[in-house]
């Protein structure tokens, strides 16, 4: 057996050991490895502070950031494909006026659906000079386009039942719509979080649609059949980056094999696993929370403070890397 196939098998075994696979249980692969407080986004008291303007908002600062943004944003409905009666609801944000045509960035939501926080990320992407569009990829499954935010439980059930092929179709439709806008350039990238990170990988493996220029996956790995990882990664033609936190055990176990396989395949890839950061570090950042006290968890305030610091450090390194990646691969100076 080749070294690459051994690596692929090792990754598959690690993933199976850390998470239940969908065909064995209804639970999705993204919840089994999360910290207890991240399985559903905890109720966060909103702050009137907007946070660091050079970073996306945290969960706590999202409302203030969205309320005070100087950028134009609106809800749009996009057909899944030409002639389709089904539409995708999406939130599109435009950068402040520019004389140049602007590339597009598709922002793919977590398993929690198109939340206010994802809209906040899209706003920050637009602040960096791109047209940002965040689709609600479960629009069809929820009964049609809606501006209402789903509950975390409802969103999780819908996202985990959406096939990869439909995700790719939805992203392609959204990208084509955004690139058709008068101010848009015919190039796009994808960034995604958790479930959206996996979706970003699969869109990259699938090849995207005309104009696809690369993807950034935050704490998400490829979803492939056991033993098929190497063949899937071999299909990649565009740059991709993976950013995760060391407390995300499943992705941490998979990353060394992905790194080695992508290097051996001579693909443009960068991966970083931030020490002490959690799954969902970009949403959490340094938002305050109480120590968790359960039968299996006995946190101290010092533990919480260390985690908050690690999450913020990961965000301060990971977001500039993301912006640099987008500008380089979308041809923005």
State where each predicted segment sits.
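Bacterial N-terminal signal peptides that target proteins for export
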Residues: 1-8
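C-terminal catalytic histidine-bearing segment of alpha/beta-hydrolase fold enzymes
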Residues: 268-333
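Primarily recognizes the serine-hydrolase "nucleophile elbow" in alpha/beta-hydrolase
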Residues: 171-235
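Serine-hydrolase catalytic machinery in alpha/beta-hydrolase-like enzymes
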Residues: 22-49, 55-66, 75-179, 183, ...
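Short beta-strand/loop motif that positions the catalytic acidic residue
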Residues: 236, 242-244
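Short alpha-helix in the alpha/beta-hydrolase fold that links the catalytic acid
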Residues: 121, 228-229, 252-262
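C-terminal motif of bacterial Sec signal peptides marking the signal peptidase cleavage site
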Residues: 15-18
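Acidic catalytic loop of the alpha/beta-hydrolase fold
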Residues: 246-251
């Amino acid at each position: 057996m080749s070294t690459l196939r051994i690596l692929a098998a090792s990754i598959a075994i690690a993933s199976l050991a850390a998470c239940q696979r969908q065909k064995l249980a209804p639970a999705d692969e993204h919840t089994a490895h999360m910290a207890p407080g991240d399985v559903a986004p905890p109720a966060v008291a909103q702050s009137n502070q907007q946070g660091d303007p050079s970073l996306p908002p945290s969960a706590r600062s999202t409302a203030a950031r969205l309320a005070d943004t100087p950028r134009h944003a609106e809800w749009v409905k996009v057909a899944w494909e030409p002639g389709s009666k089904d539409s995708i609801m999406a939130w599109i944000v435009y950068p402040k006026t520019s004389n140049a045509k602007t590339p597009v960035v598709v922002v793919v939501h977590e398993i929690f659906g198109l939340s206010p926080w994802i809209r906040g990320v899209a706003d920050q992407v637009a602040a960096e000079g791109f047209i940002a569009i965040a689709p609600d990829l479960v629009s069809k499954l929820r009964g049609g386009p809606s501006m209402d935010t789903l509950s975390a439980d409802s969103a999780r059930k819908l996202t985990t039942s959406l096939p990869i092929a439909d995700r790719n179709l939805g992203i392609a439709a959204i990208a084509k719509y955004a690139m058709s806008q008068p101010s848009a350039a015919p190039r796009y990238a994808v960034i995604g979080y958790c479930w959206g990170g996996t979706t970003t990988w699969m869109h990259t493996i699938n090849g995207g649609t005309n104009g696809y220029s690369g993807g950034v996956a935050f704490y998400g790995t490829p979803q492939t059949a056991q033993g098929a990882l190497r063949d899937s990664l071999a299909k990649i033609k565009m740059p991709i980056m993976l950013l995760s936190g060391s407390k995300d055990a499943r992705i941490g176990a998979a990353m060394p094999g992905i790194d080695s396989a992508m290097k051996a395949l001579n693909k443009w890839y960068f991966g970083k696993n931030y020490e002490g950061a959690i799954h969902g570090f970009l949403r959490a950042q340094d938002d305050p929370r109480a120590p968790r006290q359960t039968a299996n968890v006995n946190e101290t305030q010092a533990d919480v403070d260390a985690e908050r610091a690690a999450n913020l450090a990961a965000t301060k390194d990971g977001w500039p890397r993301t912006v640099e990646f987008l500008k380089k691969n979308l041809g923005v100076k």
